Amino acid sequence: MTKARCNPLWQPIPCPLSDIEGLESWLGDMAAQGLVPVTIGQNFARFRCSQPKAVRYRLNAKPAPETFLESAPGTPDGEERALAQECGWYYVTAVGDFFLYACEDSDAPELNTDPQVQALSLRYAKRQVFAPAGLLAYWLVTFWVRYAMGVWHTPVIDFVELGWLSFCYLGLLAAALVSVVHNTVLLYRFSARLTRGAEPERHKNWRKGAGRYLVGRVLAALLFVLTIVWTFAGSAMEKSRHGSIPLEDYTAPLPFATLDDYAGQPTALDADAAPAASFVLVQRLPLAPTFIKYEAHGQAGANGLRGALYVEYYECITPQLAQTMYREGKTNGLHNFPETAADAANGSIYCRTLVDGNKVLRVLLFQYQEEQIPLQELEAICKSGFAASGESA
């Protein structure tokens, strides 16, 4: 053992904590290299240096709490420790829902001599490892119920507009599901082996699959950090309208009717509106390679159109996705737009969702002038340049 390695060090755990046989075998191999565990967390274990020696490690399931409101003990009680010491074993540390014991005497009996009794002791650990699965299932059902009841109005539109961040959320959900299923299968398979009366595998090849497991954990951690950073950065960019162009500076043609088109003449943008309130934002999204967000506040002449126009235009990757977004927009037209519906008390709201192939157009127009544009004229203007079908949302 070199001097550089004599300080306490951390090592990544190469298998899930629910892989009892793999974890016990790995700790035994580390002891053979002169590394004795001090504490074991979810992903890393802390070791201290010692002389290389043969050490057996065994994980004992924590006793189940007496009531639902109580938690499992953090350390074994005196009676359990005394019984272990009589057999030549000593307590090391807690590992999740287990207590870790070690024995340096090769002639000492096993800590657990009856596999079926050991299987019964795993009941609490099995409930604990299954708890995240139940929580995930609860949230998935909750989201589905919210969508079915109309509480979550536009999940597909939200998913498209979030861009790559949506796939980060999906990746985290998939990683959580895989982890929960993997841990549950490992522990239940181990319990079934003990129930049959078979002895645990004392020298399991933990190296098989260790690289794949560690790479998966690293990727999941990186994805989690990326999602957190991206979420906060995206929220800040949305508030600052990062990448948007003031409407007066935007000269490229737009594939939909603008505020000038509805007014029938050039409009003077409202200088009293929030800074950069009138803007155009063009983005490339994974599911909508062309996404244009348009917002304009203004008035045309003394008696012309006075109001605000909000437009979202998508060119989706498939017509099927466009149809789904169209159905959501048709049913929930006012959602996902600025919350200015209260101002309609002094005017009127025109809301429209159109679809044409892989293109979707969502329009929200507020009018506040005394002589308002008739609905038929609004319909004709909205459809101009956009050959679409659909009904007003």
Regions found by a protein language model. Name each.
Residues H203-K239:
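Internal/C-terminal transmembrane anchor helices
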Residues C87-T113:
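Extended, hydrophilic extramembrane loops/domains of integral membrane proteins
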